[in-house]
């Protein structure tokens, strides 16, 4: 029987609350995280503690960010000094302030599906502070995050996150693993920020570019997915010599690799185009 009441708490739709109850899935997630005693582990949206409990079996303490005031008080009573509870909205939270020298900052959570994309983009601002992130998300979102060019799932989210993270689709989670069950399948993703070299540049497969410019270019490219780029990127003709760059405008947006979008954003942002090999 479906119910929105679990452990005496009524799941609140406006907070996107679906509580994880499958012990096998919980074990799989904690094993994937593999928390170490010196880690600073921060959980977003701990809910009723389905992940918090097994994480604290391996950690002396951890921190959580929770918006639901009823759950905030419940968590504080239950865990006491072992759990630092930050009451507030993760979309406005400064995760960088939790960083400590010599300790890995790691962020985990079963993210509310109704704010997952904005929250992922908010966390990009703290990628330099974080060792890794493990999140439960709608399966469709995870597939978009890790998608390759040419697939239906490939889009703005794929490009903007792949530029900053190495990502892995870790495991799938069926609706029956939650109470109340969501109407969609879920999945767990691992996100590891590309590290920086001593000079501050990212050690990633992609050249450095302005994230704002890249976002504008990619948003324009995908604004009309069924049309070729000659239509959606025509406004850049005064800034970019597409022929000299070797950028084929007869393609659709989903056919263009991340590296080509990055190079296009670099040129729009003022970088010199690369020399073409004859």
From Swiss-Prot:
Belongs to the class I-like SAM-binding methyltransferase superfamily. rRNA adenine N(6)-methyltransferase family. RsmA subfamily. The keyword Secreted does not apply. Gene3D superfamilies: Ribosomal RNA adenine dimethylase-like, domain 2, Vaccinia Virus protein VP39. This is Ribosomal RNA small subunit methyltransferase A. PROSITE patterns: RRNA_A_DIMETH (PS01131), SAM_RNA_A_N6_MT (PS51689). Keywords: Cytoplasm, Methyltransferase, RNA-binding, rRNA processing, S-adenosyl-L-methionine, Transferase. InterPro entries: KsgA/Erm (IPR001737), rRNA_Ade_diMease-like_C (IPR023165), rRNA_Ade_Mease_Trfase_CS (IPR020596), rRNA_Ade_methylase_Trfase_N (IPR020598), rRNA_adenine_dimethylase (IPR011530), SAM-dependent_MTases_sf (IPR029063). GO terms for molecular function: 16S rRNA (adenine(1518)-N(6)/adenine(1519)-N(6))-dimethyltransferase activity; RNA binding. It is found in: Cytoplasm. Its EC number is 2.1.1.182. Specifically dimethylates two adjacent adenosines (A1518 and A1519) in the loop of a conserved hairpin near the 3'-end of 16S rRNA in the 30S particle. May play a critical role in biogenesis of 30S subunits. PANTHER family: DIMETHYLADENOSINE TRANSFERASE, DIMETHYLADENOSINE TRANSFERASE-RELATED. The lineage of its organism: Bacteria, Pseudomonadati, Pseudomonadota, Betaproteobacteria, Burkholderiales. Its main location: cytoplasm. It holds the Pfam family RrnaAD.
């Amino acid at each position: 029987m479906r119910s929105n009441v679990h452990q005496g708490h009524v799941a609140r739709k406006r907070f996107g609350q679906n509580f994880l109850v499958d012990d096998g899935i919980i074990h799989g997630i904690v094993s994937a995280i593999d928390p170490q005693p010196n880690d600073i582990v921060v959980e977003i949206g701990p809910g009723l503690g389905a992940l918090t409990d097994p994480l604290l079996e391996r950690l002396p303490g951890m921190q959580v960010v929770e918006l639901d005031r009823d759950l905030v008080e419940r968590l504080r009573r239950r865990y006491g000094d072992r759990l630092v509870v930050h009451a507030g909205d993760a979309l406005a939270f400064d995760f960088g302030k939790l960083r400590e020298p010599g300790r890995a900052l790691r962020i985990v959570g079963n993210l509310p599906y109704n704010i997952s994309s904005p929250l992922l983009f908010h966390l990009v601002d703290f990628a330099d502070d974080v060792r890794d992130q493990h999140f439960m998300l709608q399966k469709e979102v995870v597939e978009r995050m890790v998608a390759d060019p040419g697939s239906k799932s490939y889009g703005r989210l794929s490009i903007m996150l792949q530029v900053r993270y190495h990502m892995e689709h870790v495991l799938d989670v069926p609706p029956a693993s939650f109470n109340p069950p969501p109407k969609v399948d879920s999945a767990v993703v691992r996100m590891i920020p590309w590290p920086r070299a001593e000079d501050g540049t990212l050690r990633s497969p992609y050249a450095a570019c302005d994230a704002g410019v890249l976002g504008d270019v990619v948003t324009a490219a995908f604004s009309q997915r069924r049309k070729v780029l000659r239509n959606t990127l025509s406004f850049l003709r005064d800034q970019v010599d597409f022929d000299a760059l070797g950028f084929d405008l007869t393609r659709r947006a989903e056919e263009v690799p991340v590296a080509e979008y990055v190079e296009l954003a670099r040129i729009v942002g003022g970088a010199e185009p690369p020399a073409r090999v004859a």
